[in-house]
Amino acid sequence: MKTIIVFLSLLVLATKFGDAKEGVNQKQKKEVTQNEFREEYLNEMAAMSLVQQLEAIERALFENEAGRNSRQKRCLGENVPCGDNIPCCGKLACEKTAGYGWWYKSPYCVKPTSG
């Protein structure tokens, strides 16, 4: 109990006499914050303009890439039904075959016959 009273009395004394130079401290704080905010604000504005420029460049690059269809579209493998809407893979051809085709009445993706 005695230690609590000692600490509370020290706390009261520290808060009472802690800010003896309040006017000087406030002026210094104001000057420091004004200078810091001025420099930081200018630096932040420069960084924001740089970010906006980079975003514009990135947007332009991605627009060009999206227009080129750089990725191959999905396609079907061998011995799979195909049609106008469902393409076969690059080296396969969509043909009516004597195997599955007669039963399902649809063309299938097969290796192209030479001849």
Swiss-Prot record:
| Pfam families found in the cross-reference section | Toxin_22
GO molecular function list: sodium channel inhibitor activity; toxin activity
Location comes to: Secreted
Signal peptide limits: 1-20
InterPro entries found in the cross-reference section:
Toxin_22
Q: Which residues form the propeptide?
A: 21-74
Q: Which cysteines are joined by disulfide bonds?
A: 75-89, 82-94, 88-109
What protein name does the entry list? U17-barytoxin-Tl1b
Provide the species name. Answer: Trittame loki
